Design a protein with these regions (language model features):
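Bacterial N-terminal signal peptides that target proteins for export
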Residues: 1-12, 16
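Sec/Tat signal peptide C-region and signal peptidase I cleavage site
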Residues: 18-25
């Protein structure tokens, strides 16, 4: 029985350490994804046409919800690929940040429904301001 414990001990230690490592990386992962989402909200704000504004607003959504989230569009680029599970997912446990990111998500999604460049720019500005708020 002692031999089995010695063989399993490294795996048990690793299994116990993984959740701690994940928790430690979560705020940093969320922060990096928020910064990337804000950059794309800024790109949407500066877009010269509606198609480009919508493309960057979709990037904002993709960064916020992550690949498993509602609203994620796999056919659009995911500039946050490899950074985490989505800023909203990675911010779990921080109620104020979650609420702010949900608001930014609603603003970006609203921008995706616009039919004029001015309206898309207005929603991109709202999302950018929300994402830059601390």
């Amino acid at each position: 029985m002692g031999k089995h414990l010695v063989r399993c001990l490294p795996a048990l230690l690793l299994a116990g350490a993984l959740p701690l490592a994940t928790q430690a990386a979560t705020p940093a992962a969320a922060s990096k994804q928020v910064q990337t989402a804000a950059a794309h909200a800024g790109m949407a704000l500066g877009a010269a046409d509606l198609k480009m504004a919508h493309a960057h607003l979709q990037h904002v959504v993709n960064c916020l919800v992550g690949p498993a989230g509602t609203g994620f569009d796999a056919s659009a680029a995911n500039p946050c690929k490899g950074m985490g599970q989505g800023a909203i997912v990675d911010a779990k446990g921080d109620a104020a940040t979650e609420a702010r990111l949900q608001q930014a998500l609603q603003e970006a999604e609203s921008g995706l429904k616009t039919t004029t460049l001015d309206d898309a720019h207005a929603d991109a500005q709202k999302a950018l301001s929300t994402l830059q708020t601390k």
